Swiss-Prot record:
Belongs to the class-II aminoacyl-tRNA synthetase family. It is an enzyme of class 6 (ligase). Its cofactor is Zn(2+). The keyword ATP-binding applies. Keywords: Aminoacyl-tRNA synthetase, ATP-binding, Cytoplasm, Ligase, Metal-binding, Nucleotide-binding, Protein biosynthesis, RNA-binding, tRNA-binding, Zinc. The lineage of its organism: Bacteria, Pseudomonadati, Pseudomonadota, Betaproteobacteria, Burkholderiales. GO terms for cellular component: cytosol. Pfam families: DHHA1, tRNA-synt_2c, tRNA_SAD. This is Alanine--tRNA ligase. The keyword NADP does not apply. Its EC number is 6.1.1.7.
Amino acid sequence: MKASEIRSAFLKFFESKGHQIVASSPVVPGDDPTLLFTNAGMNQFKDVFLGFDKRPYSRATTAQKCIRAGGKHNDLENVGYTARHHTFFEMLGNFSFGDYFKQDAIAYAWELLTEVFKLPKDKLWVTVYAEDDEAYEIWNKQVGVPAERIVRIGDNKGARYASDNFWMMGDTGPCGPCTEIFYDHGPEIPGGPPGSPDEDGDRYIEIWNNVFMQFNRDEAGVMHKLPKPSVDTGMGLERITAVLQHVHSNYEIDLFVALLAAAKQAVDAAGAGDSDKDSPSLKVIADHIRACSFTIVDGVIPGNEGRGYVLRRIARRGIRHGYKLGARKPFFHTLVAELVRQMGEAYPELARAEARVTEVLKQEEERFFQTIANGMEILESALAGGAKTLDGETAFKLHDTYGFPLDLTADVCRERGVTVDQAGFDAAMKRQREQARAAGKFKMAAGLEYAGAATTFHGYEHLVHEGSKVTAVYVDGSAVPSAKAGDDAVIVLDHTPFYAESGGQVGDGGELRNGTSRVIVEDTQKIQADVFGHHGRVVEGEIRVGDVLNARVDGEQRARTVRNHSVTHLMHKALREVLGGHVQQKGSLVNAERTRFDFAHNAPMSDAQIAKVEAIVNAEILANAPTQARVLPMEEAQKLGAMMLFGEKYGDEVRVLDIGSSRELCGGTHVQRTGDIGLFKVVAESGVAAGIRRVEAITGDNALAYVQQLEGTVAGLAGALKAAPAEVPGRVAAVLEQLRTLEKELAALKGKLASSQGDGLLAQAVDVKGLKVLAARLEGADAKALRDTLDQLKNKLKSAAIVLAVVEGGKVQLAAGVTADATARVKAGELVNFVAQQVGGKGGGKPDLAMAGGTDPAGLGAALASVAGWVGERA
C-alpha cells in the first residue's frame, strides 16, 4: 500500500465505525496564540475536550498536518540523521468525545492493524499505565495479547502520574492513562522491548498511542473522574507506512523515495554534479520542503520572529544542506512541484498555493545564498585553525554583520566537532543592545522607581477628569517633592483620562491644572504596566506630591489619533482580504498625523491592490457602523474568533474590539462609529526588511488636505501644459517621448563631434618604447562617446595606450584603453587610476579598458601630460 492509500484506508475504516471525517486544521493554530504550530491531532479538538465547544458529532477521525520544530516539540537537529525524526508529519487519529471508551478504542485499533492492514499479531506489543488494570484486562482477556507482550509502565519521570503512559493536557484539566502499540521489527535490529534498558533501540517502534481521558486534575493535584471520559489517539502516517511497506526507515517509504529523487536531481543540477543518494543532507532537504511548503500554505512567510523565524530556520537549514552537497544556486523551491504531485490530492490547498509557495521559497533562497557565500567564507577561516571552540565574538560578528544565524553557525560547528562559545555570543549581544538603548530615544520609564498606587484610566469614556491626585513627581529622572514653573517633569496621577503609549498608539497630550498651577502635557507613557507618567513642562505655579489636579486631554489630537488607530484595524482586515491570510501585523505607529503599519508579505503591493484596500476600507467607513469594545475572558475571545498576535502575552481577560468587519484584541482608543474616520488614503507603501512591507495612511482632514494638494499639483501641471486636468497623463507621456527623441539626437551629435575630434588627435600620439601613447581632452562628449572614440583610436593606432578625458558640470570623466598586445606591459586600470588621483578621484577596470571620475578639472592638463612618462616607466 502507498502512503496515500494507507491514509485513505485509515479514514474510511473509522468512517465505517460512525466517525465523522474532519479535515486537517492548518499547521498554524488560528485560535491559540500560545501554540507555535499544530503538533498533534487533538489540537483542533482541545476546546471540545475542555467542554468549551460543542460539535454535531461525538466521534471524529482526521489526518492532521503537524509540525514539530520549535519550543518543547523540537526535532530539528535530529532530522536527516535518524530513521524517524521529521519536522513535518501526518498524525492519523480517531477521537471520542464522551462516546466510546477503552474497550471500543482498543478493539478498533486491533481490528485495523490486524484485519485491514494485515499485520502479524505476534509482531505487536502493547504498553499500559501500571495502574490501568482495565486496559490490561482488555488487551489480555478480550483481545488475546499474551501477558509477555503487555508491558506495564509506571511513574518514570520523578513524580506521581509522571509517566510515559499517563497523559496530561497541563498542570490541571483533563488527563488519563494511555496505551501504546509497538511493532517488533525482528531480532536482526538491535534494541529491547518498551520498558527495558534497551528500549531506545530501533527494534520495537511505537506506531499508535491511545489516550484515555478519564480524570480531571484540580489545582491540588487530586484526580476526579470525568462523567464522560473521552479518547484521543494518534498514529504517525510515516511510521505505519514504513511498517506496511516492510522498510526500516521512514525515508524509504514511497512518498520520501520520490522526494529524495527530486532533491538529488535539483541539487545536482544546481552544481553538486552527482551527490550521494544516501546522504543525510538529501533527507534533510526532502523533510524540510514539506514543513516549509505547508507552513507557507497556511499563511506564514520567512521572518525574524515567531513562526516566521522557525520557517526561515527550517528553509535555510535545507538550503545549507544543499550547499553542503555542492549546490551553488537556488534549488530548494523547485521541489514544491514534486511535493504537490505526492500530496496535492490529499491536501488541495497545497496544489492551489503551488505558485505562491514556490515564489516565497525562491526569494528566501536568493537572499540566503548571498548570506551563505559571505558567512561560510568567514566561518571556514575561523575553523581552519583546528580550535575546539568557536569564540563568541566571531559567532556574533557572523550573526550581526553577515546575517548568519547562530543556530546555523552551531550546526556547521557541530558537524566539525566544534562547540560555540554561547556565553561569549550572549555577552556580545548584550553589549550591542545596551549600546543601542543608550543611543536610542529616551523612555520615561527608564530609571524611574515607583512604588505607589496604580493609575486608573478613564480615557475610554472621558477626555476630562477632575480631582486627580498627584502620587509622584520626577525631574531629571529623580523623584522630587515638587516641580516649579520652567521644570521639565513627569507627573503620576491616581486617576487620568490620558492614554499612555501602548500597542503602537502614541500617548495623549493635554493639560493638568488647578487654581494656581498648570502643566502642558506633551506625552504620556507607562512607568509600569498600570502606572501612567504624564511628561510635560510646568508653565505656571508649582506641582507637589499630594496636589489635586484637573486633567484635560487635547481633544483635537486625540480625535485625529483615534481615527488613525481605528482605520488601522480596518486596513489590517482589508490587507488580509486582498493579499491573503498570511498577512500579519509586525509593528505599527499611530499618531495624530498618520498610521504606519508593518506586516508580513513577500512582495510590493501593486497599484491595483492598494486601490482595492482603499475601496474596502472606505466602504466600511461609509457604512457608519457602530464600534463595540468588550472585556471578555480569553477563552470566550478565542471562541469569537478575535484576531490576536502570536507571541503576545495576554491576561485572563482581554479587550475585544469590533469595528466594521474587523474583530481584534486591542486596548487602544477608537472612534464611536466607522463614519467618524471620514476618509482613508494610502500615501506610501515600501519594504522595511525581508518579507516585511509597510503601509502609511492618513484619515479625516489630513486625507482631505492631501487630496486637495494633489488636485492643486495636477491643476498646476495642466496649466503649464495648456491642457485640461484629464489630459495631463497623455500630454506628459508625449513630452517624455519628445524628450527621449531629443536625447537620442543629442547623443548622436556628441558621438559625431567626439569622432571628428578623434581623427584630429591621431597626430598627437607619441612613440614610447614602441607603443603609441595618446592623452587628450575631448569637448562635448558623454561617457558613451568617450568609450566609442577610445575604441576607434585603438583600432587605428594598432599598438597603443590611450587616455581620453571630458569635463562637464565641473567634473572630470576619464577613459583609458590599452590594445591587447600591450596589456602585459601596461594595465588600463592602473593607468586610469594614476590619472584620476591627480584630478581628485579614483577608478579602475579591466587591463584593456577602464573608467574613472574626478572632481578637480584644474589638474587635468598636468595629469594628461604625465601619462607618457608613466607609460615609459612600465613599458
